[in-house]
Design a protein with these regions (language model features):
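Short active-site neighborhood of thiol/selenol oxidoreductases, capturing the structured segment around
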Residues: 69-81, 93
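The canonical Cys-X-X-Cys-His
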Residues: 83-87, 148
Length: 178
Protein backbone atom coordinates (compact mmCIF):
# COMPACT_ATOMS: atom_id res chain seq x y z
CA UNK A 1 0.00 0.00 0.00
CA UNK A 2 1.51 3.26 -1.16
CA UNK A 3 0.19 5.35 1.74
CA UNK A 4 1.65 2.98 4.33
CA UNK A 5 5.03 3.05 2.60
CA UNK A 6 5.06 6.86 2.59
CA UNK A 7 4.22 6.86 6.31
CA UNK A 8 6.98 4.37 7.07
CA UNK A 9 9.56 6.36 5.09
CA UNK A 10 8.38 9.61 6.69
CA UNK A 11 8.80 8.12 10.14
CA UNK A 12 12.23 6.74 9.19
CA UNK A 13 13.55 10.02 7.80
CA UNK A 14 12.15 12.16 10.60
CA UNK A 15 13.44 9.87 13.35
CA UNK A 16 16.82 9.36 11.76
CA UNK A 17 17.43 13.02 11.11
CA UNK A 18 16.22 14.19 14.51
CA UNK A 19 17.29 11.44 16.86
CA UNK A 20 19.48 8.90 15.13
CA UNK A 21 19.54 5.40 16.58
CA UNK A 22 21.09 6.17 19.95
CA UNK A 23 19.33 5.86 23.27
CA UNK A 24 19.88 9.53 23.97
CA UNK A 25 17.05 11.78 22.88
CA UNK A 26 19.33 14.72 22.17
CA UNK A 27 18.82 16.57 18.94
CA UNK A 28 21.91 16.73 16.75
CA UNK A 29 23.59 20.07 16.17
CA UNK A 30 22.42 20.90 12.66
CA UNK A 31 23.29 24.57 13.09
CA UNK A 32 26.92 24.03 12.11
CA UNK A 33 27.35 24.54 8.43
CA UNK A 34 28.43 21.48 6.52
CA UNK A 35 28.52 21.80 2.75
CA UNK A 36 28.47 18.68 0.61
CA UNK A 37 29.76 19.04 -2.94
CA UNK A 38 26.92 18.20 -5.32
CA UNK A 39 26.02 18.12 -8.98
CA UNK A 40 22.74 18.05 -10.89
CA UNK A 41 21.48 14.48 -10.57
CA UNK A 42 20.30 12.87 -13.80
CA UNK A 43 17.15 11.07 -12.69
CA UNK A 44 15.79 10.49 -16.20
CA UNK A 45 16.32 6.73 -15.88
CA UNK A 46 13.82 6.47 -13.04
CA UNK A 47 10.50 5.85 -14.78
CA UNK A 48 8.15 7.08 -12.05
CA UNK A 49 10.16 10.14 -11.10
CA UNK A 50 9.96 13.58 -12.62
CA UNK A 51 13.33 14.36 -14.18
CA UNK A 52 13.08 17.93 -12.90
CA UNK A 53 11.61 19.15 -9.67
CA UNK A 54 12.78 16.14 -7.69
CA UNK A 55 14.49 16.27 -4.29
CA UNK A 56 17.72 14.48 -5.25
CA UNK A 57 21.11 16.11 -5.66
CA UNK A 58 24.01 14.10 -6.99
CA UNK A 59 27.11 13.54 -4.93
CA UNK A 60 30.08 11.19 -4.82
CA UNK A 61 31.43 8.40 -2.64
CA UNK A 62 34.24 10.70 -1.51
CA UNK A 63 31.68 13.24 -0.25
CA UNK A 64 29.86 10.50 1.67
CA UNK A 65 33.16 9.53 3.30
CA UNK A 66 34.00 13.16 4.04
CA UNK A 67 30.59 13.58 5.69
CA UNK A 68 31.43 10.73 8.06
CA UNK A 69 35.06 11.77 8.60
CA UNK A 70 34.28 15.45 9.27
CA UNK A 71 31.19 15.01 11.44
CA UNK A 72 28.67 16.12 8.84
CA UNK A 73 25.05 15.19 8.30
CA UNK A 74 22.67 14.25 5.51
CA UNK A 75 20.44 11.58 4.01
CA UNK A 76 22.15 9.60 1.23
CA UNK A 77 20.83 6.99 -1.18
CA UNK A 78 22.89 4.53 -3.20
CA UNK A 79 20.79 3.52 -6.17
CA UNK A 80 20.87 2.51 -9.84
CA UNK A 81 18.31 2.73 -12.61
CA UNK A 82 18.60 -0.93 -13.64
CA UNK A 83 17.27 -2.11 -10.27
CA UNK A 84 13.51 -2.67 -9.91
CA UNK A 85 13.56 -2.06 -6.15
CA UNK A 86 15.48 1.17 -6.78
CA UNK A 87 12.83 2.32 -9.25
CA UNK A 88 10.16 1.93 -6.56
CA UNK A 89 12.26 3.31 -3.73
CA UNK A 90 13.25 6.51 -5.51
CA UNK A 91 9.65 7.42 -6.21
CA UNK A 92 8.65 7.00 -2.57
CA UNK A 93 11.79 8.67 -1.22
CA UNK A 94 11.11 11.67 -3.44
CA UNK A 95 7.54 11.99 -2.19
CA UNK A 96 8.65 11.80 1.45
CA UNK A 97 11.50 14.27 0.87
CA UNK A 98 9.07 16.71 -0.78
CA UNK A 99 6.71 16.45 2.19
CA UNK A 100 9.57 17.04 4.65
CA UNK A 101 11.29 19.69 2.54
CA UNK A 102 14.68 17.94 2.58
CA UNK A 103 17.10 17.02 -0.17
CA UNK A 104 18.53 13.54 -0.49
CA UNK A 105 22.11 13.06 -1.65
CA UNK A 106 22.06 10.61 -4.55
CA UNK A 107 25.01 8.33 -5.33
CA UNK A 108 24.56 6.67 -8.72
CA UNK A 109 25.83 3.10 -8.35
CA UNK A 110 26.28 2.74 -12.12
CA UNK A 111 27.64 6.17 -13.01
CA UNK A 112 30.15 6.49 -15.83
CA UNK A 113 31.34 9.86 -14.52
CA UNK A 114 31.90 8.59 -10.96
CA UNK A 115 32.32 4.80 -11.37
CA UNK A 116 32.02 2.53 -8.33
CA UNK A 117 32.24 -1.12 -9.35
CA UNK A 118 35.80 -2.30 -9.82
CA UNK A 119 37.27 0.95 -8.51
CA UNK A 120 38.70 2.39 -5.32
CA UNK A 121 35.27 3.99 -4.80
CA UNK A 122 33.81 0.53 -4.15
CA UNK A 123 36.38 -0.12 -1.43
CA UNK A 124 35.70 3.27 0.18
CA UNK A 125 31.93 2.76 0.02
CA UNK A 126 32.27 -0.73 1.46
CA UNK A 127 34.40 0.59 4.33
CA UNK A 128 32.03 3.46 5.15
CA UNK A 129 28.87 1.34 4.97
CA UNK A 130 30.35 -1.90 6.35
CA UNK A 131 28.29 -1.99 9.56
CA UNK A 132 25.05 -1.44 7.62
CA UNK A 133 25.63 -4.30 5.17
CA UNK A 134 24.04 -7.58 6.30
CA UNK A 135 25.94 -10.83 5.97
CA UNK A 136 24.75 -13.32 3.38
CA UNK A 137 24.41 -17.07 4.00
CA UNK A 138 28.19 -17.46 3.51
CA UNK A 139 29.03 -14.81 6.11
CA UNK A 140 30.09 -12.32 3.42
CA UNK A 141 28.91 -8.75 2.99
CA UNK A 142 27.98 -7.35 -0.42
CA UNK A 143 26.83 -3.83 -1.20
CA UNK A 144 23.21 -3.76 -2.33
CA UNK A 145 20.88 -1.20 -3.83
CA UNK A 146 18.90 0.70 -2.90
CA UNK A 147 20.49 1.68 0.39
CA UNK A 148 19.34 4.74 2.27
CA UNK A 149 21.71 6.01 4.96
CA UNK A 150 21.24 8.84 7.42
CA UNK A 151 24.35 10.46 8.88
CA UNK A 152 24.25 12.76 11.89
CA UNK A 153 27.40 14.24 13.43
CA UNK A 154 29.50 11.93 11.25
CA UNK A 155 27.81 8.75 12.47
CA UNK A 156 25.50 6.49 10.51
CA UNK A 157 22.36 6.71 12.60
CA UNK A 158 20.19 4.53 10.41
CA UNK A 159 19.98 2.65 7.17
CA UNK A 160 17.55 0.71 5.03
CA UNK A 161 18.71 -1.73 2.38
CA UNK A 162 16.38 -2.99 -0.31
CA UNK A 163 12.64 -2.66 -0.16
CA UNK A 164 9.61 -4.30 1.27
CA UNK A 165 7.38 -1.99 -0.72
CA UNK A 166 4.37 -4.29 -0.60
CA UNK A 167 3.25 -2.51 2.56
CA UNK A 168 1.99 -5.78 4.01
CA UNK A 169 5.61 -6.87 4.44
CA UNK A 170 6.12 -4.22 7.12
CA UNK A 171 5.09 -5.27 10.60
CA UNK A 172 4.45 -3.01 13.58
CA UNK A 173 7.80 -4.22 14.95
CA UNK A 174 9.57 -3.08 11.75
CA UNK A 175 7.98 0.36 11.94
CA UNK A 176 8.82 0.77 15.64
CA UNK A 177 12.50 -0.05 14.92
CA UNK A 178 12.63 2.81 12.41
Amino acid sequence: DRLLMKKVLSILLICLVLFGCTNKQEKPDLSKEFVIETYKADMSGYENLKSSGHMFVGTTVSELKRTVDEGGYGVFVLSRTGCHSCQLAMQYLNEVAEELGVYIYYIDAQSDAYPILGTENYDVLYEVLYETIPENENGERDLQTPEVVTIVDGKITGSQIGTTWGGSNYTDKDVSKL
